[in-house]
């Protein structure tokens, strides 16, 4: 499972302490240094043996993703869930085969309700910030598969 939290670097130890109280612990002794370098905590839920990659979001696009998240009630817990548009943009940016398969599935299920302009604006920002030119083309190629 992947999740993103908005947390400052100096708050990581407090976050780890709070998660440990719920049986969520680092997957390796290097998890803290990996978090510092790559802004992702590699964790493990002990009881279920489920791996959890916790992305340490910060100012910028991740803040915007969180602001646009939709609240879902999951068994009485109110959980913010990234919008389909932002998930598509993030998965196209990641670009792994599994991510692109996920995009195909999201497009198939949500095509009529998606704000494609938002996805395109987000991908354009990624391209400009990262000096890339392939992300909008990927969206075009993936979306052309669905009428």
Give the ranges of each region predicted by the language model.
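Compositionally biased terminal segments of proteins
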Residues: 1-147
